[in-house]
Amino acid sequence: MGSNRKINGIKPRGSSMTCFIIAEAGVNHNGDLQLAKELVYAAKESGADAVKFQTFKADTLVNKTVEKAEYQKNNAPESSTQYEMLKALELSEEDHYLLSELANSLGIEFMSTGFDEQSIDFLISLGVKRLKIPSGEITNVPYLQHCASKKLPLIISTGMCDLQEVRVAIDTVKPYYGNSLSDYLVLLHCTSNYPASYQDVNLKAMQTLADEFQLPVGYSDHTLGILVPTLAVGMGACVIEKHFTMDKSLPGPDHLASMDPEEMKNLVQSIRDAETVLGSGEKKPSDNELPIRALVRRSITLRRDLVKGAQISKEDLILLRPGTGIAPSEISNIVGSRLSMNLSAGTTLLWEHIEA
């Protein structure tokens, strides 16, 4: 898994290719197409690889009497139930068409999380390149089967899951991909709270997913700031997903735990800087180290004047900077050899000074 083989446009864990960054607009458009368009422009400006929305119909997603999660109650007090909140956050099919066209025209990949089979079929009709499975649907076996039957790349978030639940999800989709599963599936570690505390992140679980299932992994981040997603890249994440908003003060469930456009841009730059810092993994001096190496390493140097033909003893030598001459590791080959010319004390010995 350390090769540079692409996984449907996404790098495998441990490769030297760039991380796939998803700017998660989610429902931060508040049901407003113009605000959704602004999010597409901002995602492109940030340097992210994709902008992602959410595709659902409240009528087929949630019972009308289900209460909201605690963070939803705190962040979106204007609605009394999940249904009421989500109904106001729907995008129409026409909205999706327009957002997809805008993203394509800007050169940023359009993505959306479809929450049911009909939404998945609609997204495929829009030409999406991959499907994103949200954490809440990971135990929805009929839905997983429907998604996998499309034979598109899958990104599965694993928030609120234990390993056995992830294993069942993988076993559900695997028959549709066979031995090519690792070319199509990326698992995202995730903590499903908005915002997630550092204590709850448990980022090492991302590595556990990679080790347990031998699949590419990434991280869907709900913490505040850029530390955790940047660290995840250093730990091998090939996908990073991060919520962003045009304005954190807007009403709605996810704005407070989202980045503003400038922060999103900073995150993308931080990830790209992290990739640069990680490098290729090959242990060798950098081009900028080579001049310094010559100055701070030692060479075999004459301690006293010697004439041509003199046999060199250990007492004739001292090891001094710079390291432009014969290396100290060759001293056993130099002691007992003879000079090919007259040399003065302080001369940095070169091989041309030694008789063949």
Curated annotation (Swiss-Prot):
Its EC number is 2.5.1.101. It catalyses: 2,4-diacetamido-2,4,6-trideoxy-alpha-D-mannopyranose + phosphoenolpyruvate + H2O = N,N-diacetyllegionaminate + phosphate. Disulfide bonds: none annotated. It holds the Pfam family NeuB. It is an enzyme of class 2 (transferase). InterPro entries: AFP_Neu5c_C, AFP_Neu5c_C_sf, Aldolase_TIM, N-AcNeuraminate_synthase, Neu5Ac_N, Nonulosonic_Acid_Synth, SAF. GO terms for biological process: carbohydrate biosynthetic process; glycosylation. Transmembrane segments: none annotated. Keywords: Lyase, Transferase, Virulence. PROSITE patterns: AFP_LIKE. CDD domains: SAF_NeuB_like (cd11615). One of its GO terms (molecular function) is N-acylneuraminate-9-phosphate synthase activity. Residues 299-356 form the AFP-like domain. NCBIfam families: NeuB_NnaB (TIGR03569). Involved in biosynthesis of legionaminic acid (5,7-diamino-3,5,7,9-tetradeoxy-D-glycero-D-galacto-non-2-ulosonic acid)(Leg), a sialic acid-like derivative that is incorporated into virulence-associated cell surface glycoconjugates such as lipopolysaccharide (LPS) which could be a key determinant in the ability of L.pneumophila to inhibit the fusion of phagosomes with lysosomes. LPS contains a majority alpha2,4-linked homomer of legionaminic acid. Catalyzes the condensation of 2,4-diacetamido-2,4,6-trideoxymannose with phosphoenolpyruvate (PEP) to give N,N'-diacetyllegionaminic acid. This is N,N'-diacetyllegionaminic acid synthase. It comes from Legionella pneumophila subsp. pneumophila (strain Philadelphia 1 / ATCC 33152 / DSM 7513). The lineage of its organism: Bacteria, Pseudomonadati, Pseudomonadota, Gammaproteobacteria, Legionellales.
